[in-house]
Amino acid sequence: MDERAALAQSSEEQGWRRRAIDERVDVYSRGAIRIRLIWQGNSKLSGASIFVDEWYDNYTRDLGTVRAWLKR
């Protein structure tokens, strides 16, 4: 299983709603939090941004950080 699919599966189990915008962009949302991920293929993250109450909060290129965000 590739990183993108694995992240989609684990986030769904934690109550996140995933929307695939296109072949490179996924948006996860739950409550007031929205996380936007941009991928290079299905295994390499280009970057991700987290928004809380529609305000930009942080940016990362680290998949481990994204996993931590999704554990909120």
Where on the chain are the PLM-derived regions?
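Negatively charged, low-complexity tracts enriched in Asp/Glu with abundant Ser/Thr
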Residues: 1-22, 54-65
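Amphipathic, interaction-prone secondary-structure segments
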Residues: 15-44
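Intrinsically disordered, low-complexity regulatory segments enriched in Ser/Thr/Pro
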Residues: 37-61
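Short, charged, intrinsically disordered terminal tails
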Residues: 67-72
